[in-house]
């Protein structure tokens, strides 16, 4: 559970570390989802983020680290040939981040699995200082829903990652009238926002008649909006316009965080 005293101690510790290790200005960035609770919409947001980069003609490397989600619903289910599946449950942990950045695009989008917390935290504890010294920055994406467990998951990750990452929190409205009172009103969430100043974005509720077949067939909002698919039920004029509207507004939200998404 998130603790403001722990956070303050962590901030001092990591700030002191950076004063000893002179880190260059970031030239590369890893954007990773904070795992923990599954089914909150992490992959849905990462799909939109990948299309946002694509719309700006910014090259990225897509990594699917969700080893439990083997087929439908995984990042690879949507982008397949563009996505590399990585098993982080090895002694090397998240070293794949460093290797892919050294070989390719300056930005990595990493969709983490629900059980990735311990591996991620241990890797940051052992590798962060040396990796940061090479000019690599990190942005952690947290997804909150009306379920308090989604909020607790983010607070737990933040208590371990501390200020070694920048934070973007996405309020995912999974119902038509979503209630985010726990995220917005709980004392621990307020402490998190005060200490780490996350950029908070909104991902609006999507009609089930669009969202469900899109997941089933592995198609993105962009593919629906631009009619780049062969799924009859998603070619209805109303759903095409809906997809265009959802994507436009979500891109506008992502624009608010671009300072934490680019190197």
Predicted regions and their residues:
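C-terminal accessory extensions appended to soluble enzyme cores
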Residues: 6-16, 152-153, 229-263
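Walker A/P-loop NTP-binding active-site region of P-loop NTPases
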Residues: 30-88
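Switch II (G3) loop of P-loop NTPases
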Residues: 106-123
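Inter-motif core of Ras-like GTPase G domains
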Residues: 121-147
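Beta-strand-loop-alpha "switch" segments that mediate conformational coupling across diverse proteins
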Residues: 173-178, 182, 189-245
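Conserved C-terminal guanine-recognition region of P-loop GTPase G domains, centered on the G4
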Residues: 128-129, 134, 148-167
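Conserved beta-strand segments of the P-loop GTPase G domain that flank and frequently precede/overlap
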Residues: 63, 110, 140-145, 168-173
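Extreme N-terminal, non-catalytic leader segments
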Residues: 1-32, 99
